[in-house]
């Protein structure tokens, strides 16, 4: 699993603000507005306990601190426990947390202790980035290119199919692409005869996975994938609306989904 680095999370508040203004330009709503409209829920200062976890590759510098800044940005009352792991979980509950946020190297979860609802970051991230892309006000058709059909990309592509979009899918893993084509009934995209899209959704751990041949002027590229799916040069050349942020939008999706 591709893990975040402390560098990915630098200036998380600036990254969130920048992503929010792009989301507003693309959909007419800010991230809060999209989450509220999509999930039908609104935060009202729920107490969120953020528990650092030392397993596997261990604690990621400023991961917990970023989650605190993100939860505050979206209207929650949050704290990071002083202890990690089991002791931290105990500390969070004893200090009145209604929602637990914690992540090991494979699963990043949000658990609402009051209503029992639980969310996983990977599907929640794919679905919210796909939802934002699907709300692009200037889209010229219902055709979408989805690049990367893994733990984040597949749920996002499935969400776009469910919303009635014509999804053209691509993944470097041919077997996975074939399975996704049959599971979701999407069209396999062939890089050898490309066409241009006004909506592109990318979720891969590789850079430059969206070729120039598929980019149309002012298209939306909604991409949780890290590193970025296109170069700064291509983004400027085509006036691409790039929705890309390392942690906050996916975390908001998790939290709104369990309220
Ligand atoms: N921004 C955010 O909030 C979040 C970002 N992520 C990031 O999203 C990315 C995807 O995560 P997962 O879905 O969990 O990974 P995954 O490994 O389950 O799926 C990635 C997929 O991309 C495909 N792929 C790799 N290189 C490719 C290429 N050049 N062209 C086409 N397909 C290619 C792989 O075959 C794989 O199927 C990672 O970079 C991860 O760090 C994950 C969660 C949240
Ligand atoms: N155990 C560590 C956190 C590990 C998080 C690993 N997961 C990722 O990097 C995923 C989450 C969103 C994007 N990638 C800590 O508590 O500091």
From Swiss-Prot:
Binding site for L-pyrrolysine: 4, 53, 60, 103
EC number: 1.4.1.-
Binding site for NAD(+): 151-152, 171, 206, 224, 226, 245
Pathway linked to the protein: Amino-acid biosynthesis; L-pyrrolysine biosynthesis
An example molecular function term from Gene Ontology annotations: oxidoreductase activity
Reaction equation(s) it catalyzes: (3R)-3-methyl-D-ornithyl-N(6)-L-lysine + NAD(+) = L-pyrrolysine + NH4(+) + NADH + 2 H(+)
SUPFAM superfamilies on file: MurCD N-terminal domain (SSF51984)
Free-text disruption phenotype from the record: Cells lacking this gene are unable to translate UAG as pyrrolysine, and do not produce pyrrolysine.
GO biological process, one term: pyrrolysine biosynthetic process
Keywords tagged on the record: Amino-acid biosynthesis, NAD, Oxidoreductase
Record function comment: Catalyzes the ultimate step of the pyrrolysine biosynthesis pathway by converting the isopeptide (3R)-3-methyl-D-ornithyl-N(6)-L-lysine to the 22nd proteinogenic amino acid.
NCBIfam families documented for this protein: pyrrolys_PylD (TIGR03911)
Family designation: Belongs to the PylD family.
Protein name per its UniProtKB record: Pyrrolysine synthase
């Amino acid at each position: 699993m591709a893990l975040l680095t402390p560098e990915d999370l630098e200036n998380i508040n600036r990254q969130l603000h920048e992503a929010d203004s792009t989301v507003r330009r693309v959909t007419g709503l800010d991230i809060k507005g999209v989450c509220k409209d999509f999930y039908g829920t609104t935060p009202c200062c729920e107490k969120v306990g953020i528990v650092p976890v030392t397993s596997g590759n261990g604690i990621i510098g400023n991961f917990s601190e970023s989650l605190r800044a993100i939860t505050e940005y979206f209207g929650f009352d949050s704290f990071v426990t002083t202890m990690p792991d089991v002791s931290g979980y105990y500390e969070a509950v004893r200090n009145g947390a209604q929602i637990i946020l914690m992540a090991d190297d494979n699963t990043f979860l949000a658990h609402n202790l009051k209503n029992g609802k639980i969310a996983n970051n990977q599907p929640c991230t794919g679905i919210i980035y796909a939802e934002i892309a699907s709300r692009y006000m200037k889209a010229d058709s219902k055709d979408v290119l989805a690049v990367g059909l893994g733990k984040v990309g597949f749920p996002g592509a499935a969400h776009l199919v469910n919303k009635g979009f014509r999804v053209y899918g691509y993944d470097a893993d041919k077997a996975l692409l074939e399975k996704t084509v049959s599971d979701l009934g999407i069209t396999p995209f062939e890089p050898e005869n490309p066409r241009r899209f006004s909506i592109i959704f990318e979720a891969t751990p590789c850079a430059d996975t969206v070729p120039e041949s598929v980019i149309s002027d002012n298209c939306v590229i909604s991409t949780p994938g890290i590193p970025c799916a296109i170069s700064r040069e291509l983004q400027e050349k085509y006036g691409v609306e790039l929705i890309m942020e390392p942690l906050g939008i996916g975390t908001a999706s998790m939290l709104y989904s369990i309220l």
